[in-house]
């Protein structure tokens, strides 16, 4: 919407670039109450972490604990159809999904958003695998994972969990 574009392009990007002091007071006339439109944090890809988690497809037990504990939702599990997996980027490694019934037809991937990650390492600490499925690596070595994150966000929401819940 126009509200998002105006706020993100005219205010948020300048503030994030440390140029907020160049903004005229008139830039804030639509926000006199100090509010910001909901959802604009999706545009704040700051890349502030020194180190970010790297997922090891060969060590993951698919427990999703890393995703549960991430305070910034920067690491998330994804299920893919065979077709989606075939169309994934070459660096997009997947596993056969663990589980019963309908889940078995999917592929699994744990994906990190390197630009949203704050580098706290809580995900690594929470990993219960005997050999940790996540290790911290320098952000600059993982920037290519942003393409994988962007691909993950295009995946269909194909799984119905209603019959799997208690």
Predicted regions and their residues:
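Ferredoxin-type iron-sulfur electron-transfer modules in oxidoreductases and energy-metabolism complexes
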Residues: 33-52, 78-110, 139-151, 156, ...
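Acidic catalytic cores of enzymes that act on phosphate-bearing nucleotides/polynucleotides
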Residues: 6-20
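A charged, amphipathic alpha-helical module
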Residues: 1-2, 35
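Iron-sulfur cluster-binding cysteine motifs and their immediate structural context
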Residues: 39-41, 65-84, 103, 113, ...
């Amino acid at each position: 919407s126009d509200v998002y574009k105006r706020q993100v392009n005219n205010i948020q990007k300048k503030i994030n670039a440390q140029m907020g002091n160049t903004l005229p007071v008139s830039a804030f006339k639509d926000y006199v109450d100090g509010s910001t439109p909901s959802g604009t944090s999706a545009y704040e890809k700051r890349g502030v972490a020194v180190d970010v988690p790297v997922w090891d497809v060969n060590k993951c037990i698919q427990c999703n604990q890393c995703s549960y504990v991430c305070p910034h939702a920067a690491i998330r599990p994804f299920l893919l159809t065979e077709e989606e997996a075939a169309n994934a980027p070459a660096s997009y490694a997947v596993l056969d999904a663990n589980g019963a019934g309908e889940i078995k037809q999917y592929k699994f991937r744990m994906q990190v958003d390197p630009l949203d990650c704050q580098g706290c390492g809580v995900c690594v600490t929470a990993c219960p695998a005997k050999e940790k499925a996540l290790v911290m690596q320098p952000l600059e070595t993982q920037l290519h994972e942003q393409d994988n994150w962007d691909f993950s966000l295009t995946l269909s929401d194909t799984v119905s969990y209603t019959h799997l819940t208690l």
